[in-house]
Design a protein with these regions (language model features):
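Conserved ABC ATPase "signature" region
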Residues: 72, 132-150, 259-260
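Conserved ABC ATPase signature
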Residues: 155-159, 163
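ABC ATPase NBD coupling module
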Residues: 75-98, 116, 124, 131, ...
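Short catalytic/signature loops enriched in Gly
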Residues: 3-4, 78, 145, 152, ...
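ABC ATPase "signature
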Residues: 237-241
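A short, proline-enriched helix->beta-strand linker immediately N-terminal to the Walker B motif
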Residues: 174-178
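A short, surface-exposed alpha-helical micro-motif characterized by mixed small hydrophobic
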Residues: 222-224
């Protein structure tokens, strides 16, 4: 088993309303270096809240009620994420952990070219780079995600949904983070484009060695791409196992219910394609 990259211990998030709502309850898990960890569960189970919480991206009334998150940096330094001040946390994000947000392909600025939006990442986080260097990095990123450098002057409306999503993946990949969190990255894409995006995520993971937390309610999709899957229900992780174990030998009744809720073309379970 590879070494850990992220350790989450007894992590809890509460929405401070009347009455308070426990959105994440004492979650403990470990993400391994180079691993794709799927996070599955129905809408409202706390998946996105957990992902935002470990990156300290929560907004009021959500508050971290307990627990800790440790990032095991490739340099050998263990970083207590909850202990970082605001400035250090801003430096940490995108450099160490990046995120592809839910509905991200619609988050691009419609009146700015994709090239200028990608350059902004380097302008903010790599201020020592000159314009020529930034442009070269952007062109390379567009080639890596198979959008193509010829699209550098294109506006978002000139790209398909799949291409816009690839641009968002390029943005998350820009600073070569060790962890990429993806919140429903294939939502609103047709099945063929979904499959292309999933294949590319897997290829990029192998090429650059980053880990992925992949969040979705679509369990069959996670069975294809994930090394391990955590099943979440009502703020708790009720099962955590390899994708094969989740598919062939689920232990929790809720996991079995999730698996049985997806229709199949035949009356029997299909063969897991990985």
């Amino acid at each position: 088993m590879s070494e850990p990259l992220l350790s989450v211990r007894d992590f809890s998030v509460v929405y401070d309303v009347d009455p308070p709502v426990e959105a994440v309850k004492n979650v403990t898990l470990e993400l391994h270096r180079g691993e794709i960890l799927g996070l599955a569960g129905e809408s409202g189970c706390g998946k996105t809240t957990l992902a935002y919480g470990v990156q300290r991206l929560l907004r009021a009334p959500a508050v971290i009620a307990g627990g800790g998150v440790t990032f095991h940096d490739a340099s050998g330094v263990d970083v207590d994420i909850n202990a970082l001040d605001v400035e250090a946390m801003q430096r940490f994000r995108w450099n160490k952990i990046s995120m592809v947000f839910q509905g991200a392909m619609n988050a691009l600025n419609p009146v700015a070219t994709i090239g200028s939006q990608l350059e902004d990442v380097f302008e903010i986080h790599r201020p020592d780079m000159n314009r020529r260097q930034r442009r070269a990095e952007v062109e390379e990123l567009l080639e890596i995600v198979k959008v193509g450098r010829q699209r550098i002057a294109s506006f978002p409306h000139e790209l398909s949904g799949g291409m816009r999503q690839r641009v968002m993946i390029a943005m998350a990949l820009a600073l070569r983070p060790q962890l990429m969190v993806m919140d429903e990255p294939t939502t609103a894409l047709d099945v063929l484009v979904q499959r292309e995006i999933l294949k590319q995520i897997s290829q990029l993971r192998h090429e650059f060695g980053f880990s992925v937390i992949f969040i979705t309610h679509d369990l069959p999709l996670l069975l294809e791409i994930s090394d391990r899957i955590a099943i979440m229900r009502e703020g708790e992780i009720v099962e955590l196992a390899t994708a094969e174990q989740i598919w062939t030998d689920p232990q929790h009744e809720y996991t079995k219910t999730l698996l049985s809720s997806f229709p199949r073309l035949t009356g029997e379970r299909g063969v897991l394609t990985r």
